């Protein structure tokens, strides 16, 4: 029985991994469709599309899937049923934390209902457009795989006009994150590539103007569960919160 139980657990874990992988593929494919629809189908002349393709390839999406998504977005392939649109939703979590949710949907009513259910379940509220948007600004973020020569990076950033940089660690990897104005994101990215920095990602992110400190473990748990629930929704592309968790709030989570 133990062996059977172990095998059942492995199958369930694999199903969860496969489901998550499927959602990632779907989100990245939709991002390619929208990018191709908004600009040129040639990634060389469309930075948004080029970035979406790079992310898709990094995630292991086959080239034929990428080509099909580009064809759908550019109108070269019948995309009936794939009329995706980008929508931003806003709301509050417990403790007054503001949340911005970026979604791609072919059914606004379905997406809004799913979001509202998640907010209600974890003590939040889905608000009207504009209720928290003023608490955030957009920033270009370029992620560079380390190790990075800081002197070389600083010299390059002075030349390109980037705003700032910081070193972070993600999945046990050292990464340099460069912040730029949105208008020069492409220029700075290409300049860093030309100087042989290994670019992992270049994207536009929402950044909170001020953070809300959460010290209570129960509030932290509710917020994390809310953000996880929102991110798990098929139509959701990203979730941003202006929250800073204090160390004691995360104890035991």
From Swiss-Prot:
Q: Which GO terms describe its molecular function?
A: DNA binding
Where do transmembrane segments lie in this chain?
Answer: none
Concerning InterPro entries, the annotation shows: Integrase-like_N, TACO1_YebC-like_2nd/3rd_dom, TACO1_YebC_N, Transcrip_reg_TACO1-like, Transcrip_reg_TACO1-like_dom3, YebC-like
- DNA-binding as a keyword of this entry, yes or no, is yes
What are the GO cellular component annotations? cytosol
Localization, per the record, is: Cytoplasm
Please report which protein family the annotation says this sequence is part of. Answer: Belongs to the TACO1 family.
What protein name does the entry list? Probable transcriptional regulatory protein AM1_1847
